[in-house]
């Protein structure tokens, strides 16, 4: 049986203009990698069709050990309080190779 290890999956939905700021923040907190996907949908701010290609939405996925998560969440919460549009949610995941996320 394959050994699995617990980690946290941080998902952030925001605008493309936030990418550089968030990536810089991730590096500051020791995040080793991330995945960025285009995102479309509707929510509290209305519908985003991504027709213009300008300031469209993206989803960033980051797997982190629990001990790194709190500082990252505090940083995101500060940005939200400053008025940045961020939707943040965290899930429990299991990975085969935990050293990849340290």
State where each predicted segment sits.
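Positively charged, small/polar-rich N-terminal and surface patches that mediate targeting and assembly
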Residues: 1-102
């Amino acid at each position: 049986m394959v050994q699995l290890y617990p980690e946290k999956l941080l998902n952030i939905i925001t605008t493309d203009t936030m990418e550089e700021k968030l990536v810089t923040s991730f590096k500051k907190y020791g995040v080793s990698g991330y995945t960025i996907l285009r995102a479309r949908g509707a929510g509290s701010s209305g519908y985003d069709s991504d027709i213009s290609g300008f300031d469209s939405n993206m989803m960033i996925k980051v797997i982190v050990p629990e001990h790194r998560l709190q500082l990252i969440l505090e940083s995101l919460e500060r940005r939200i309080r400053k008025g940045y549009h961020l939707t943040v949610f965290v899930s429990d995941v299991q990975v085969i190779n935990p050293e990849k996320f340290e």
